[in-house]
């Protein structure tokens, strides 16, 4: 139903109510009854200003756009603007990554291009706002040819956590990194000094860039809001100018895909079957997730290396090497391209000599099936042969299935995985056609 238009009479009534002390206690209907004889006694010249005011109010009401709200009371227009800005920022980030790779490729320096991988652990997140309290930071500098050339790792003690969120911080720490909460936390307590140290380390290999160029780091899409927020948290206490170079956080998954496409192009290999879903699926498998000796001493001791940021950034570098170095014939160096201690994911068993070993080529040396029937011969099983061919013929071992025969209903296994055991006949007395238990 359309709203009623204003008229000159009601405009006069509202003004009479505002200016006449007698009308303060009257309702609208009573005020209308009082003003009706006054309005009828007024001439057209006296009514003119009120009619003009009502007309102008109607025009303004028609032209004014009413802001739409969502079910939570937020502005729909503002949400659309934020959504469009996020899409635009993501497109600009992807184009920037593609330009970096293309520039390195055209200059024949693709294998020497440095990339910095970063990761943060946090204690808790604010209920309102994108604020994370940092707990641990790690970064590594990586290139295809040199592997992991250097890394930076430190624990952080912010001194306190967000008021009222101690329980959330305890639960998050218990299920992930298991770092003690502030004020008993480990590591640096001066956030400003720590930010300057991190920024200086990230800028070591960027002397040739202009001072206003940002420092680009890479992390996973899930950690991008965490990394951005933790950098802001540290920078808030640092004495830096607004014109200082900033840190930009980019998506490592898109870098992984773009770099793989360029590596195959340089190697002269067809890359038509390579798409973002293929490379992303390989990356998230995280074949080095439980590798020993790549996390900090604390997480190594408490068996939480999976959640250690130092382990994360190194595993990303190893994944890059495992997926791309063989395409450029780059030898894998233990400790730089692959872990120092490598445990292959399969058990070698002898097979018939008729097996064709060149039937398939694994994408990763660490993604092989649990058991591979393979003839030993003189095949190299070193980590550098990550793309060696293996046979499809393998026998999976699944200890969760029941291995007995199921010839009758009595032998069908119960829900717990055990076959029902029938009692021995000696436990019963046979008499009067009934079985009576002792």
UniProtKB/Swiss-Prot annotation:
Functional summary from the UniProt entry: Involved both in the piRNA and miRNA metabolic processes. As a component of the meiotic nuage, plays a central role during oogenesis by repressing transposable elements and preventing their mobilization, which is essential for the germline integrity. Repression of transposable elements is mediated via the piRNA metabolic process, which mediates the repression of transposable elements during meiosis by forming complexes composed of piRNAs and Piwi proteins and governs the repression of transposons.
Localization per record: Cytoplasm; Nucleus
GO BP term (any one): regulatory ncRNA-mediated gene silencing
Matches recorded under Pfam families: Maelstrom
Family: Belongs to the maelstrom family.
GO CC annotations, alphabetized: cytoplasm; nucleus; P granule; perinuclear region of cytoplasm
Protein name: Protein maelstrom 1
Compositionally biased tracts (Polar residues): 381-391
Keyword Transmembrane helix listed: no
This protein's UniProt keywords: Cytoplasm, Developmental protein, Differentiation, DNA-binding, Meiosis, Nucleus, Oogenesis, Repressor, RNA-mediated gene silencing, Transcription, Transcription regulation
InterPro entries named in the record: HMG_box_dom_sf, Maelstrom, Protein_maelstrom
Gene Ontology terms, MF aspect: transcription cis-regulatory region binding
Location of the region described as Disordered in the Swiss-Prot/TrEMBL record: 374-438
